[in-house]
Amino acid sequence: MSLGYLKGQPKALNTFLAEHKEENALRLWYDAPAKDWQSQALPIGNGYMGAMFFGGINKEQIQFSEGTLWSGGPGSNEDYNFGVRKDAWKHLAPVRKLLDEGKFEEAHALAKKELTGVLHKSENDLSTFGDYGAQQTTGDIFITVNHSEKVSNYKRSLDIEKAEGYVTYNIGDNHYKRTYFGNYPSKLMAYKFESDQAENYTIAFSSPHKKTKESFKKGLYSYQGEVIDNGMQFETCLKIASDGKVSFDEGKIKVKNAKYFVAYHVATTDYINQYPTYTGNDFIGENKQLIHQLKGKSFEDLQKEHRLDYQNLFERVDFHLGYKEGEDLPTDRRLMAYSKGKNDFWLEQLYFQFSRYLMISSSRPGTMPMHLQGKWNNSTNPAWACDYHMNINQQMLYWPAEVANLSECEEPLNDYIESLVEPGKVTAKEFFNARGWTVSTMNNPFGYTSSGWGFPWGFFPAGAGWISQHLWEHYEFTQDDQFLKNQAYPIMKEAALFWVDYLQEDEKGNLVSYPSYSPEHGGISKGASMDHQIAWDLFNNCIAACEVLEIDADFKKEITTIRDKIAPPTIGSWGQLQEWMEDVDDPDNKHRHVSHLYALHPGKQISLEKTPEWAEATRVSLNARGDGGTGWSLAWKVNFWSRLKDGDRAYQLYRRLLQPIGFEDESIHSSGTYANLFCGHPPFQLDGNMGGAAGMAEMLIQSQTGTLEILPALPKAWKSGSVKGLKARGGYVIDISWKNGKLKTLSITSVKNGPCTLLYKGKQQVKEMVAGETVEVKF
């Protein structure tokens, strides 16, 4: 693009640039209201709550869920015991004996009976998950305005640079505008409806939960309710401000003769993340305080507060692959065109930044971590309980947090991990007679750390080891010694103690994990590869932490010996990396889980540089598994191929991840991306969005080997571009630009003094860094 004709015309140039920026603003937009929640409605959030707005013309629907509202848990029945099967460990030796004898069916039957978690069900259950529970929708706000005339110029949009949603349209000369946002500092949502001419509105709230009290006074609506199966108490409030007349009649708020009204929305529960009761929050008092703080603040004040807070995080990273080309199509139509082979680099950078938007909107300090759907859930019985799945999903949700410069957004996960340690110690003791703590696949807000109640999907004692990796990663990216000393390392050490006790020596002298089960694939086994790779990684991270903190020399020595005895990755008969110790991998198997490649990503045991034979075996395994799979599976494969430095293959998988799914007119694939850019497992799961974004970052920078590699897997399609603000292990912030596939500029800022080893296309440099200073690097 040439701007030469505007030289010497600063006003014209500034106007052009402003218009060009507006044209290329990062936003999703549509020319019709949403008809479907998961594929079309648009998400907003403040970390504590998530809401989806549909943009209906005569009737707006805003569905929302508060992050701590759950069924199940201690209040659901007197027998709730966090899924623990007391003295289950007594059956561990018999299961191991059967495995040693090769009696796998008998071992599976015994483990299924005695090493699975306990689930109680009753007729009062709101979900199919019994007293384990499920995340709950809080309810829906319906805002009705009766339009009898034809609407024109309709537009529904989500501006992810401001984290605000909009609906605009005209009826004749009357212009209508709606604005929606979630404010984290003030812990509220705000919805503003405006029109040139006065209108009448009716606002109603609907909840699937039992109503215990409802009131309206001085523009403040309160709905207090109870989750029927566990007695969890909650309250949601709407504070209405308007230039019209506000009243309450027959359970509905009426706003008459108004050119505008604003609904300030808060919601809280009595939940506290404190084992073993998980209750006691003064939710009514909290809401009262939240409403009181609105005094003297205008909508614009809260909007400004929100933007400053959000943009402080969002604007850390600027990712540019290209401008919009051709017609400015609605997002759903852009996605369809992209699926038919059209290059759309603007859409790709939008997807990356949309993932960051979702993380900022759903995971902030003091909130619960993201669940399978972030903070967005419209059901009392959601898929997989909308819980915290520890056999890939929960981890993938946070893969981009550090590299995408959102370290603060990982704090809820770190705090949640810490809350699992105490109940996880009970699980380790009762199921495995082991020290330390562990979790399996399914985890809820109520300390459920036991094996799941179904053995093939629920038995995964490596869950704590895997999730503990995030604690070490947070340290590596931030270099926060106090975090490592006071929070991360004590948790990591306890997770490692579990493996010190659980690993058993086999006839070859190797330490193996058994019984084990490669996540959701195969059968019970003696030594699933993923278990060994996770244990190796955990020990390795603990050893590094001991060295940083200069503590625990004896423990470091002990686990170094154990780490080096763990059964190593094995290459099988057709060149594959084996998923089990037995060479039984099927080259025609296309299973979605690729668990045995953990050591390649997100682990560090396998790399092209240090273990080329193992790396080649992972390539063979990936080729055999193919390029299909669920949404999150596709995202994981983007990361795998990036680690193998095959940017074009990673990009091929990335494009596959963005294939449309769930469209009314056609459904091209069984998994991919919905019209609102949510990832489709299906159904909607947020992990695919996050894994896809992490994979894009892996193409541009990698630092897992201790060397900061620049553009390690740049796809040919991304001929030119730039990215500013990505983070790397070691505490570095990176700005990169490239042209015609070659590095153009590189600058690095470090949080600490010391050497930084850099690698670009086989050329290595070492730069001496000074904390806070930026270094320009030439290759």
Regions found by a protein language model. Name each.
Residues 391-402, 461-472, 530-541, 595-604, ...:
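Well-ordered alpha-helical segments within folded domains of soluble proteins
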Residues 494-545:
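Acidic/histidine-rich catalytic neighborhood
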Residues 516, 559-564, 711-718:
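A glycine-rich phosphate-binding loop feature that marks nucleotide/adenosyl-phosphate handling sites
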Residues 374, 378-379, 511-513, 623-692, ...:
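C-terminal catalytic domain of Rieske-type non-heme iron oxygenases
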Residues 481, 485-499, 641-657:
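Extended amphipathic alpha-helical segments enriched in small hydrophobics
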